[in-house]
């Protein structure tokens, strides 16, 4: 079955926290097999996210972080001195904000691309009633049930 990466990752995370003691043996086996099938997708996704963050936090990012610290210090001084910022100071802060807005946008695009990528997973469907038993025992919300509904018959 093909699913979006984020769907597989969310399902893996939800399955990991389930208390399966009240489920039938067949349903418990299905949960275990699904964990096995979804784990590599989840681990690869987490690794990819780390790599994206590391890639984005390059030398330019470090320089901009330093500029942020300097701008914060400037804002503190301006407040202490009870004065208005100069136009040059305002431009510096606007430039920093614009750079980080573009940086965040690029990061979000990469992360969305990773999350939306389709992956093939071999999952075992199980009865919805069994899923509800596990969720009751695990004190989970229906929002979390929804993340696993695609695994049920």
Regions found by a protein language model. Name each.
Residues 1-153:
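A composition-driven surface/loop motif
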